[in-house]
Every structure is written in C-alpha cells, then in structure tokens.
C-alpha cells in the first residue's frame, strides 16, 4: 500500500500506531480512506503544512451520490484522526458531524440443523497437507473458532482479539476486553465448549507455545477480519447453498436462546437482561431487536408478560453491525 507523504504524515502514522496498539483498527477500510483523504489534500491544497477546518469540512461533506452508511465509512477514519489530534492539543479543528445510521431491514439467515451439521463436519475434515505450521494451526483453530461463535454468541471481532490470558481454563470464563464500544464483559462457556477449548489449548501450545492471542495468526498477531470471512465462505459454500455469513452465528445463538424460553415458567425480563449482558450489549434495547426476527415471538412475549410487553419489545433500531 502507498505510504503517507504529506506534511501531516507523521501525525497520521502516530494515529494509526495508537489505534493498532489498542486493537481498534480496520486495515481493510480505515487506512485506504486516510490515504485517499491525504491525496485529496495534496491535490486541492498543494503545499499545505497543517490540517485546516476547510480541508476537513470539504472532505467530510456528504456527497449527493452517497448513502449515510457510505459516507460514514469514508469519513469515519478522518473524524477519528481529528478527535485524536484534539485530545492531544494538536489541533483546534471541530469534529465533522457523521451522518446517522439509516434504518435498515436485515434478515439474518435461519440456519437449519442439517446446514450446521454439514458446516461443522467440514470444519473437522480440514486437511493437513502440506504439513507445515500454518496448515496445522488452521486445522486446529477453525473448528474451535466457529464452534465458539456458535455456542457463546460472541462477536467475530471479540473471538479474533481474544488473548490467551483472557481464557480461564479452570472455570470456563472468557474475559471479553475488546468489544463493540469497548464494553468489557465476561462469558461463561458451556461444559462441552470448555472441554473443546482445553483440548485445543494443549494442541496449539505444542505448535505456538509463546502465543499472545488464543487463536494465533502469523507474527504473534491476531487473525484479520478477512481470515474469518474467507474460512467461513470456503467451508460453508463447500457443503451448503443458502447465503450466510459468520456473524449470523451470533444471531442464531440469540434466537435459539429466546425460542427455548417458550413454554418455560420464567420471567422474560430477567432472561432478556441476562442474554443482553452475556452478548455484550450496552443496553437491553439492543437485545430486544432479536424479537423481530423470531417468528411468533412477539405474541409469545405478550402472552407471557402482559403489561411488561411494551417495555420488552419497543420499536428500536438494530445497533449491531455485521462483520
């Protein structure tokens, strides 16, 4: 990728190092958009020595051809850069206003038992040739990584950034330190998942004894988003036809839990609160979204909760993003 070349290049590079160190950096979109912004500044303000309000405002203005989400992706890294500079007293520029998220209708794939069986059997059948470290590591990691998503409902990012020290092997507790909105929380693993995690740890330890991340990539780093996407895509479409993405395993986890409550003499408020906390939602409103994708759940909730129905399932927007 082309390097930064302008007078503000050292500041941009410092910003990138900071975000990478805190594990909050998207290499696939953030860096390219910062490079395009720098190129825009060089072309339209030749010889500039510092960032100005006009430069930032002109770049961040929403274009006629842009949807809100497209604009958010394009200007987000620049807004983050300006915020970084302001927090350190390096600029007096005001942060541009980021367009609000547009309401969208997203219907996640409803996994069938056969599809999931096909998928996990294929995960378990990965080959070991050529017999080298990357291939052996993938053979061990992929089945456990995706089963962890399936059994715990954690985000793909949370699983990727999970450190070895974040996994309590004795009690089966995950310390989710890097989450959406930096909302640290803890996950209790099912006994069967804990057993699988322990076996994986023993096996991967023989290959990567000094690893930092629980699911290690090369150079003692964590796997990138593209690793999740490619592995899920290649395995899924090798045995299934319906469209699906890895993030939908999280939706599946929520729906399966909610469906299990039907017929149980339990308090839905308590169950929703527990599910909300375990999934790392900052507010219960985010969890209430799932009622809209479970067929018939609204009627079930009305029958179970009566007056509490409006509190449980008001109309809210989904604040989750697919990874």
Can you name each region flagged by the protein language model?
Residues 1-323:
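Conserved catalytic core of the tyrosine transesterase superfamily
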């Amino acid at each position: 990728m082309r390097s930064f070349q302008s007078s503000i290049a050292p500041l941009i590079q410092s910003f990138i190092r900071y975000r990478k160190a805190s594990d909050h950096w998207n290499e696939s979109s953030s860096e390219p958009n910062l490079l395009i912004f720098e190129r825009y500044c060089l072309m339209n303000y030749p010889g500039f020595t510092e960032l100005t309000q006009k430069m930032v405002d002109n770049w961040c203005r929403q274009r006629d051809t842009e949807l809100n989400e497209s604009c958010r992706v394009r200007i987000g890294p620049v807004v983050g850069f300006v915020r970084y500079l302001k927090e350190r007293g390096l600029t007096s520029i005001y942060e541009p206003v980021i367009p609000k998220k547009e309401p969208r209708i997203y219907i996640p794939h409803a996994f069938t038992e056969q599809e999931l069986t096909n998928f996990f059997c294929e995960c378990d059948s990965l080959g070991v040739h050529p017999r080298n470290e990357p291939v052996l590591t993938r053979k061990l990691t992929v089945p456990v990584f995706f089963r962890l998503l399936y059994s715990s409902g954690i985000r793909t990012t949370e699983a990727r950034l999970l450190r070895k020290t974040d996994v309590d092997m004795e009690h089966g507790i995950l310390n989710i330190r890097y989450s959406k909105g930096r909302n640290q929380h803890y996950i209790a693993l099912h006994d069967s998942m804990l057993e699988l995690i322990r076996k994986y740890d023993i096996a991967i330890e023989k290959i990567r004894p000094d690893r930092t991340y629980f699911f290690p990539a090369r150079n003692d780093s964590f796997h990138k988003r593209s690793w999740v996407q490619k592995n899920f895509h290649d395995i899924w479409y090798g045995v299934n036809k319906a469209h699906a993405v890895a993030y939908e395993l999280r939706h599946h986890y929520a729906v399966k839990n909610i469906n299990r409550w039907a017929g149980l003499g339990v308090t839905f408020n308590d169950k929703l609160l527990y599910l909300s906390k375990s999934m790392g939602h900052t507010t219960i409103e985010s969890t209430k979204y799932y009622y809209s994708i479970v067929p018939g759940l609204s009627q079930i909730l009305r029958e179970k909760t009566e007056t509490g129905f409006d509190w449980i399932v008001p109309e809210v927007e989904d604040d989750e993003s697919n990874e």
